[in-house]
Design a protein with these regions (language model features):
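Active-site gating loops and adjacent loop-to-helix segments of metal-dependent hydrolytic enzymes
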Residues: 67-100, 183, 229-247, 270-276, ...
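Short acidic/polar active-site loop segments enriched in Thr and Asp
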Residues: 117-118, 182, 311
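N-terminal metal-binding scaffold of metallo-dependent hydrolase/deaminase domains
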Residues: 1-41
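His/Asp/Glu-enriched, well-ordered alpha-helical/loop segment
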Residues: 214, 235-246, 279-286, 296-334
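Metal-coordinating catalytic core of metallo-dependent amide/deamination hydrolases
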Residues: 94, 121-255
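Divalent metal-coordination and catalytic microenvironments
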Residues: 13, 29, 50, 61, ...
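Alpha-helical scaffold segments that flank or form the walls of functional sites
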Residues: 70-122, 130-142, 171-178
Length: 334
């Protein structure tokens, strides 16, 4: 850097790959040098005291509209996914935009304090008022200077079930996209039948192709080894040329699938360029609830996915809400 003054010099830092005693130089908002023993003049000098300095954490799957709502209007007695969905349905009519914004902003403070600077949050679009969508779009605007909040239009109650008609939730989802929501979501395993689940995937992927958007679907969040919607998701991704734009979240049914079927499924996922998000804290809490013994852990097959070259990320999913009574926005815990 010669004699030029740096904006920031962070000294005595540990960085990933086990390197210690490193200095990190920042100028004009960019990291310009990382090296051992660097000692240049800077407007601000921070001694990291040997602590880890790394890129910010990313939460690839979260539900900010439900965060910090634990106990409203009651708690989940069974600890199951289905009771959590029913409980959220009881809470939705009681929601206000003010409360949604306050809880979401409080959670964003937690997240930033834990090193999270990017969150992909699903937001329920089944309420025709779209209160949660409006609230989280406002939160996204408020936190934009310091946190990248990406929103997924998520039909929590199913795309093709409920509402005032078979396509009410689809129309709500389209309205949410028009309002500025970034990604198309879905929940095929919660539709009324396997056929409707497959149909919902086809409809949503076609919408993504039309609008040039990414897809992130809750997929096969079940202990049922025959819940195989991820296969349909991979097929539609290839059919519509959505390679690299589609994510399957949860995929907990893969934990229970026959190994022969999985050996066929994994190459299909690779060909489609599917991304996968596992949510360990919530998956091991909600899955296996109907088992006697031994009880399944319910995690998808992360080692096998990685071995095949699938891009795998992790999410916190829930914090103190109808599905999970714990959580602290800590991705290291995840």
């Amino acid at each position: 850097q010669g004699t030029s003054m740096l904006d920031l010099l962070r000294k005595n830092a540990a960085v990933p790959a086990g390197r210690a005693g490193m200095a990190i130089a920042v100028s004009a908002g960019n990291i310009v040098e990382v090296s051992a023993g660097l000692d240049a003049p800077a407007h601000v000098v921070i001694d990291a005291q040997g602590m880890l300095v790394c890129p910010p954490f990313v939460d690839a799957h979260f539900h900010m509209d439900a965060a910090l709502s634990y106990g409203l209007p009651r708690v989940n007695q069974s600890g199951t996914l289905l009771e959590g969905i029913a409980l959220w349905g009881e809470l939705k009519p009681l929601l206000t935009q003010k409360a949604l914004i306050e809880r979401a902003l409080a959670y964003c403070d937690w997240a930033v304090g834990k090193g999270l600077l990017a969150i992909r949050s699903h937001v329920d679009v089944c309420d025709p008022r779209l209160l949660a969508v409006e609230a989280l779009l406002e939160v996204k605007r408020i936190v934009a200077p310091y946190l990248d909040l990406q929103l997924v239009a998520f039909p929590q109650d199913g795309l093709l079930r409920g509402g005032d008609g078979p396509f009410q939730h689809l129309e709500n989802l389209k309205r949410a996209l028009d309002m500025g929501v970034d990604v198309i979501g879905g929940i095929p395993h919660f539709e009324r039948s396997m056929a409707d689940g497959s149909r919902s995937i086809r409809v949503l992927c076609e919408l993504a192709a039309q609008r040039g958007l990414a897809v992130d679907m809750h997929c096969d969040e079940s202990d049922d080894p025959y819940s195989r919607h991820v296969e349909t998701l991979a097929f539609e991704t290839q059919r519509l040329g959505l390679h690299g734009r589609v994510t399957g979240s949860h995929l907990t049914s893969m934990h229970s699938m026959d190994n022969y079927y999985v050996s066929k499924l994994l190459p299909l996922m690779v060909e489609a360029g599917l991304h996968v998000v596992a949510n360990p804290l919530i998956n091991i809490t909600l899955q296996g609830r109907l088992d006697s013994y031994p009880k399944r852990r319910g995690m998808t097959r992360v080692p096998e996915l990685l071995a095949h070259g699938v891009n795998v990320a992790f999410g916190h999913d829930c914090v103190m809400d109808p599905w999970y009574s714990l959580g602290s926005a800590d991705m290291l815990e995840v």
